[in-house]
Structures are given as C-alpha cells and as structure tokens.
C-alpha cells in the first residue's frame, strides 16, 4: 500500500474527460480491463419493481426465489429477537437448567449447537477472535483519576471475575484483558461509578459487560414487587440497563451479552425503534434481566407500562457523548431522573465513549457519584495501526477514483462512507453494475434490510459496505481492512470515528479519504491527526494549511475539535468548576445545546440526526 497514491495518480483518475461525474465516458476502469462483460445485465425495472440502493440483494432474491433476499435469510429478527434466541442458554434459561436456587447460581448444561452459534467454530479461519492482536495493547498508556482507585488486574482470573463468566470468556478466545478492561473490571466490582474514555476497538463493551455479569451472577435476581405479579400487570423488571444511541450498536451489545450470559440465569433483551414494538414487548414479558435499549424506544415502553426501572442496579451509557450530541439528553434525563429508577446513590452508573469533552463531563456529574475517570490511550485520536492516506479528488472524478482504488487494492472487507442516503444508494448501484458485491445501510432502510446487509458484510458475502453516518460510531465489524471516505465529514471527530472501523482490536488497517476544495474546513484537524499518528502529510494539505493560516480562516473543524486535547482529561484535576467531592444542583429541565459551550450547534439537519423518523428511535 506504500505506493498506492502513485498507482492512483498513474491511472489518471483526475482527468475530467474520464467522466468521473457521470455521462458517457471512454474511461475503462482497471478492474474491467482484464474482465469480460458483467455476469448480468441490469435492465430498467418495471415501475412496481423499482427499489433503491443495495437492490443487489432483492434482485438476486427474485432470481433465486428466496424471500429473504440474495442470501436466503428465511426469517427476520422482528425487533432484534428471533427464534434463534430462544433455543437455550441466555435466552431460554428456565428450560435449559440454568437457574438461581436458594441463593446459589446453578449453570445450565452445555449446548454444542448453541456454542457454535454464539462463539463460532474455533478452527474456522474467519473465526472472529482469532485475529485479535492482544499484545499490541501492552504499551497503551492508561490514566485513572479519582479517590481510592483500585489496582488494575493483569489477566482474566476468578476472583474478581465469576467462574462461569471465565468459561465464556475462554470460549470467546479472549486471552488477556485490554487496558480499559484491566481497570474497569476492578473498579466496577468494587462498586464504583466510572467514566471511561477509550479509542474505538479497545474492548469497551467487555469493559462494562464483564464486571456487570460477574456481579449479577453472584447476587442473583431482584424480587419482583408483589403488585406486579398478576398477569394483567406483567412488565419487565431488569436489573441492568444499557443505553445506546443506535439500533445497530444496541444489537451489537445484545449479541455480546448473549455470549457471556451463556448457561447463566441472566436473560438479555434488546429494544429499539424501526422494528415491531409488539414483538419486543413479548420478549420483555418472557423475562428480562439485562435490557439493552435506545432512548426513544425505551421511553415508549415506559409510557406503555411494559418496563419498570425500579430494580435497576447498573446503568450503562455507551457512546454517551454521541447520544447527547444527537439530542437524546431530554429522553435520557426522563429515563434516569423522572421514572422509577433508583437514585444515583442507590445504583452504579458507567459511562463509556471514545470522547468526553469537558462540557460533557460537566453534564455527566448529574448521573455519576464519586466516580473514577479512566482515560485509555490518546482519546480522540486515531490509532497508529491505521495507515491514513489523503488523496485529492474532485467530486466529478470520485467514481473513477473509487474504481481505480478498489482495483489497486481490494482485499478483505471495504467500508465506504458517504454523506447522504441518496449517495449511498447511488454508489451501491454503481458498484453492483461494475460487478462488485456491494450493499448499503442508512436510515431509510428497513430493519430487516439493514440486518441482512450487515450480516452479509460480516460474513464476507458482500465485501463492500456503503454507509452513512448511522454506522460511523460503535459498530464492531470484524476484519474491515480498508475504510474509504468517499465523502469527508465536516466534523473532524466524525473522521476519527469513521476510520476507527478498521485497525480494531490491535490489528492493522488502511483508511483512504477523497479530499477536495469542499473540505478545507477540516484541514487543520487532518494535519494534527496525521502528525500525531506519525502519518505522511500530503503536500497539497500542507500548502492549504499555510494558505489558511495566512488568510485567517476558521480551522476548528466543528464539533468537539476545539476541546480534543481536553477530551481525555479529568476536568476535576485540570480545571473547571468542581472537585472530586463536589456536587451541583440537578438540572431537571430540558437543555438547549446551543447555549452550552464547546462547539455544540444544531447540526442535526446536516448529519441526518434531526429526522423525527430516524431509525434509532
């Protein structure tokens, strides 16, 4: 990949006569120079057959007769749960022998079929955990601040972890804890609140699931109030609640929870918008000990009286900064402060994210009590495991440049980011017509379509995924080797999170971005990120930076950038109001992000988060 920019330049991708922006072109992409015609010709569909973006699956599904699309998926998840989740283990614990009897946890019997479903086949070359390079984590710096910080653990052991959980961790082939897990496990098992900042792919999900399950396995279920035991007043009484900004992230956390609750009494459930609420309510009715939810859907269930938070022992906010940035603060405050959830003194609260700017830390004081602040690695920065390449490509030449890039280097899974839903559909159709196996996810897709697309991408059936910002945060897609920013974001932190989809779990990856004159607002941010990750800075970017500096241009990059260097520091040590023991009056009203410092604006219309029909509700 070292000579990739030279390869691209030799292919004359910036020649406007090559038709990069559409229209009739004599340009022959490299990947077609040695190929025949496409294996199928795309005819103009009838009006009733027209579909948008990623119709590769639907067209092929009509050809093969599978209602589930090209991949033959015969069943939809119906709100994140399917028949697969009721075949034993964590989802059907009563019939699998795993139970809580007389204050003792009795694990259920082993189930080979379920183990293969949850953990994969260990000798499979595509087995998920086999590619994790744990040794690459050893030199990552960690800073923990607060009163009486517990000593970190060095390996997975019992204690502090539960023995059954240890068996499940071994089944998942996790050999040693990541830096965030080394600190979070003893912190949580000691009963402390936690705010943890760690870069993407650092094991944040295990950082809260492992200690949480350890405590649940040992303490057992909380009693259900007598008045709630009649059939007509049935509702879920979870012991732990995990809030996530998007349904993709919620589903991902749920899938991990299924693994580590295998053979235990704990039954996880997931609820999110964009799926039938009736199916989700029935799943909660069957028993819910750990609830993973998006804020909007959880509020809906609370209003319907289908969920009570009275038994919550553990509250987790994952990707907390993104939830607040997306405008979920009123919903989160309603859930935490205005429903029947125990007070901050009577529960444990954990907040995990890749960035925590100072103003978000101030807000977090309302949800945390005497917490420990944990900063792992260079928070808000990119990993040196990711090779970053910035190419200058005009808008009209992007399609040609993309074909050249995919032809020059297309091994493994490629994730392509665009700014709009329309472009996601158009680019996916374009790639399909060029004989690439591509699919797309964005907010206008149905839940079934998005799950099929993600499943196909993870299984390497479709090796190119075109995505909008909905997939930029939190998704753990294994084995992504190349991230392409077809459209660069206007916010430099979005750039960081996008390219963080590769180079995860200690592995290496490549991130290529198409830059042009429309992206000058993030020049300074790109320069700093490239320099701090020891990456090569293109000459054109250095020239633009000097020009902007002389011209006095605004170079903040939007969003959190102006406080990037503060995002990994505990404001209690480095200034700001308050100290380790300080409290402040709770703000129970709704807030307007425009009145809070730190660069927050009403940018929802630009990134798709302002749509009332947004998919994460």
Curated annotation (Swiss-Prot):
InterPro entries documented for this protein: DEAD/DEAH_box_helicase_dom (IPR011545), Ded1/Dbp1_DEADc (IPR044763), Helicase_ATP-bd (IPR014001), Helicase_C-like (IPR001650), P-loop_NTPase (IPR027417), RNA-helicase_DEAD-box_CS (IPR000629), RNA_helicase_DEAD_Q_motif (IPR014014)
EC number from the UniProt entry: 3.6.4.13
Catalysed transformations (reactions): ATP + H2O = ADP + phosphate + H(+)
Gene3D superfamilies given in the database record: P-loop containing nucleotide triphosphate hydrolases
Short name of one Pfam family: Helicase_C
Residues binding ATP, per UniProt: 198-205
Top enzyme category: hydrolase
Domain Helicase ATP-binding: 185-374
Region Disordered, residue ranges: 1-90, 542-617
Cross-referenced CDD domains: DEADc_DDX3_DDX4 (cd17967), SF2_C_DEAD (cd18787)
Any one Gene Ontology cellular component term annotated for this protein: nucleus
Record keywords, A-Z: ATP-binding, Cytoplasm, Helicase, Hydrolase, Initiation factor, Nucleotide-binding, Protein biosynthesis, RNA-binding
A GO BP entry: positive regulation of formation of translation preinitiation complex
Composition-biased stretches (Basic and acidic residues): 38-58
Polar residues: bias regions: 7-17, 79-90, 580-594
Compartments where located: Cytoplasm
Residue interval(s) of motif Q motif: 154-182
Keyword Repeat tagged: no
Domain Helicase C-terminal positions: 385-545
Any GO molecular function: DNA/RNA helicase activity
Span(s) of short sequence motif DEAD box: 318-321
Extra facts: Present with 1480 molecules/cell in log phase SD medium.
Protein's job: ATP-binding RNA helicase involved in translation initiation. Remodels RNA in response to ADP and ATP concentrations by facilitating disruption, but also formation of RNA duplexes. Redundant to DED1, may be required in conditions in which DED1 expression is decreased.
Domain comment, as recorded: The Q motif is unique to and characteristic of the DEAD box family of RNA helicases and controls ATP binding and hydrolysis.
Name recorded for this polypeptide: ATP-dependent RNA helicase DBP1
Gene: DBP1
């Amino acid at each position: 990949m070292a000579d990739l920019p030279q390869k691209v330049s030799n292919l004359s991708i910036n020649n406007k006569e090559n038709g990069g922006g559409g229209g009739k072109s004599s340009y022959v992409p490299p990947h077609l120079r040695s190929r025949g015609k496409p294996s199928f010709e795309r005819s103009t569909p009838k009006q009733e057959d027209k579909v948008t973006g990623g119709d590769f699956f639907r067209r092929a599904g009509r050809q093969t007769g599978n209602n589930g699309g090209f991949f033959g998926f015969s069943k939809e998840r119906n709100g994140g749960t399917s028949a697969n989740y009721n075949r034993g283990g964590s989802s059907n614990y009563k019939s699998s022998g795993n139970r809580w009897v007389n204050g003792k946890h009795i694990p259920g019997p082993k189930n080979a079929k379920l183990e293969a479903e949850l953990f994969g086949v260990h000798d499979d070359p595509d087995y998920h955990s086999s590619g994790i390079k744990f040794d690459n984590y050893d030199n990552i710096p960690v800073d923990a601040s607060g009163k009486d910080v517990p000593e970190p653990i060095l390996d997975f052991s019992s204690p502090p972890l539960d023995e059954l959980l240890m068996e499940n961790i071994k089944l998942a082939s996790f050999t040693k804890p990541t830096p965030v897990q080394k600190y979070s496990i003893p912190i949580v098992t000691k009963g402390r609140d936690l705010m943890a900042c760690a870069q993407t792919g650092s094991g944040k999900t295990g950082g809260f699931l492992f200690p949480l399950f350890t405590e649940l396995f040992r303490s057992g279920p909380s009693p259900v109030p007598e008045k709630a035991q009649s059939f007509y007043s049935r509702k879920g009484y979870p012991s732990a609640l995990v809030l996530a900004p998007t349904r993709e992230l919620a589903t991902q956390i749920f899938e991990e929870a299924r693994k580590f609750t295998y053979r235990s009494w704990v039954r996880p459930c997931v609820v999110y918008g964009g799926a039938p609420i009736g199916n989700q309510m029935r799943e909660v009715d069957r028993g819910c000990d750990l609830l993973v939810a998006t804020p909007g859907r959880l509020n809906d269930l609370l209003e319907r009286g289908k969920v009570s938070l009275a038994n919550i022992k553990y509250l987790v906010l994952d990707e907390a900064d993104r939830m607040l940035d997306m405008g979920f603060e009123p919903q989160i405050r309603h859930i935490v402060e205005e429903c029947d959830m125990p007070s901050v003194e009577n529960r444990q609260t954990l907040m995990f994210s890749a960035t925590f700017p100072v103003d978000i830390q101030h807000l977090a004081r309302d949800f945390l009590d005497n917490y420990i602040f944990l900063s792992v690695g260079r928070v808000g920065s990119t990993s040196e495991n990711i090779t970053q390449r910035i190419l200058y490509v005009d808008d009209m030449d992007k399609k040609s440049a993309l074909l050249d890039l995919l032809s020059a280097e297309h091994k493994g899974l490629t994730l392509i980011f665009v700014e709009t839903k329309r472009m996601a559909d158009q680019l996916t159709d374009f790639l399909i017509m060029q004989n690439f196996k591509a699919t797309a996810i964005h907010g206008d897709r149905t839940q079934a379509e998005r799950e099929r697309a993600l499943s196909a991408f993870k299984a390497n059936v479709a090796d190119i995924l075109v995505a909008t910002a909905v997939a930029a945060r939190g998704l753990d897609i294994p084995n992504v080797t190349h991230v392409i920013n077809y459209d660069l974001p206007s916010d430099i932190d979005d750039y960081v999170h996008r390219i963080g989809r590769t180079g995860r779990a200690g592995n290496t990856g490549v991130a290529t971005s198409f830059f042009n004159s429309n992206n000058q607002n993030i020049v300074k941010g790109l320069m700093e990120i490239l320099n701090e990750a020891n990456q090569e800075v293109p000459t054109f970017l250095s020239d633009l930076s000097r020009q902007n500096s002389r011209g006095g241009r605004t170079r903040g990059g939007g969003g959190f950038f102006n406080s990037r260097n503060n995002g990994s520091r505990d404001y209690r040590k480095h200034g700001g109001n308050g100290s380790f023991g300080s409290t402040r009056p709770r703000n129970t009203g709704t807030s307007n992000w425009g009145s809070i410092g730190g660069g927050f604006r009403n940018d929802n219309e630009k990134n798709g988060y302002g749509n009332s029909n947004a998919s994460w509700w």
